[in-house]
Amino acid sequence: MTSLENALAVNAGKAVVISIKREWLSKIMSGEKNLEVRKSRPWEISFPFAVFCYETKANGGAGEIIGAFTCEDIDQLNCLTGLSPYYADGEKLSGMADKFIRESCIDIAALFEYGNKTGMLYGWNISNVRKLSLPLHQLHLKRAPQSWQYINLNANDIESVAAAIQ
């Protein structure tokens, strides 16, 4: 059983699908990016959970699920207290802010811009990355999620996913 299949088993087939641009997904697939930064996080799922990556059609993207990973944990970064003072003064970053910048491949200015209105950013820890190729309808989706959404897979779906992993 792969870690992805284990994550699906832990959550009785419940998983998450994210929409992600080609440039960021390439960094995940290559192992360069180990933290996916989002303004929200799933609360109704247990760790580890499976994350399927829908590559958007922007900039020549595939427009289908082309990757998956296991999320073992989610870190939090308060941009107002964890980034703001450092961004303004150019001081050394705190441990969590440094981790977000180093592992997400996002510089401090972009991170601050992304999170300064909501305040809190969530860093989804990426592990066990797998390449696969699935159309959205195979995961019972009619359209790509705006950011992310839950999906529920049955035993046949999980078997199809396992067969699609390269």
Residue ranges with predicted function:
Residues 2-166:
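Structured alpha/beta reader/binder surfaces that contact nucleic acids or chromatin modification marks
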